[in-house]
Amino acid sequence: MKAELVVIGGGPAGMAAALAAEEKGIKDILILERDKELGGILNQCIHNGFGLHTFKEELTGPEYANRYVEKVKASRVKYLLNTMVVDVQGGKYLSLIHI
């Protein structure tokens, strides 16, 4: 599998980075996430306080993460779940384990 840009981690920062890269014109983007769903640690943060700066409203962690998940799903960004990066060689080649 080839990609112009690979983002390791499908939390909000990884998803935001992938979406920003797409806005800058990078066409072939892949997010690799070790968990069974995108969203990262925020899926466990049930308290309010997220999203005020980005979305102009107060959200729980899962709500905030879901906003980014929906943006990724509506974009051309691809993602692989249950996938761990175990090695990077020469800055270009990744060894993956699909769990």
Please report, for each region that a protein language model flagged, where it lies by residue.
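The identity of the second residue at the extreme N-terminus of proteins
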Residues: M1-K2, L80
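Beta1-alpha1 glycine-rich phosphate/pyrophosphate-binding loop at the start
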Residues: A3-R67, K71, S75
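Short, hydrophobic/aromatic-rich segments at coil-to-beta transitions
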Residues: G90-S95
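Conserved small/polar residues in nucleotide/adenosyl-binding loops
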Residues: I97-I99
